[in-house]
Amino acid sequence: MSVFGRATFSAARFAEARPTYPASLFKTILGYYNHEDPHGTLLDLGCGHGIVARELSPRFARAIAIDPSDGMIRLAMQTHAEHTKISFRQGYAEDLSFLPAHSVDMAAAGQAAHWFNYPQVWPELSRVVKPGGSLAFWGYKDNILIGHRRANEIFEKFCYGEGEVLPGVEGMNQYWERPGRDILRDLLADVKPPESEWDKIKRITYNVDKDTKEIAGPETAWMRKKLTLGQFEAYVRTFTGYQGWMDAHLDKKSRAEGGEGDIVDFMFDQILEAEPEWKEKGDRWRDIEVESVWGTYILLATRK
């Protein structure tokens, strides 16, 4: 079962801690779509708590948003009850049988396309997206804290290191849901719309350079923001790798929950040791503000 369907998964906590999309991203998406008057139908695949449908729906007559997680759909309906042109339903990108042929003007997927089973998804999208309609997939992978190489190395180790990351403590690597995570880390390089049915294919990718820390311009490196270390800590706890680790270590609780610590607590212990200026803040280290940038991709295509 996917992490998002487990009883231990909190849709509300996930939604609260995840980074938001900048306006520049939606400007890029709608600039490619290039229809000025609100008309037609938007299909939001893997809608989560409904952010994409909310932001894009003003350019459409109606929006249909689907997600496999019942908890996410309930949260989306509660959060966006006033957006009457959006309809939310539980569903999968692999089964769009509820939609007529050529009924969709844009199919969008924000931070969801790495989960898709493409041998099933491409035929469905080719059927429901009308000729001249658009496809827009985008997402983000691992972030870095700009100017903090040692913290980034520890973050990488705890997320993807093999075996034990501390004596007697295994990292999160084996608990990521694969192949989805690997597809995302590769920025969907191998996800290719069939050229027999799609054209005007465009990719915008940004792979974070952990060594030089050179940051691209805002169109390419569009997922960049300031956040506190406390917000970064909460974000890490939304990772599917973290959720999988917790499900495998039911005896572990975070210190915030009265336990002796979980994998994220242990990781930040190491990060604070590596960043003395942060450690000097004592219990107030979570208030420290840092700048972060994510590796990102945008994949755009037009139905022939």
Task: Tell me what each language-model feature is.
Residues 41-96:
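Class I SAM-dependent methyltransferase SAM/SAH-binding core
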Residues 187-304:
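Conserved Class I S-adenosyl-L-methionine
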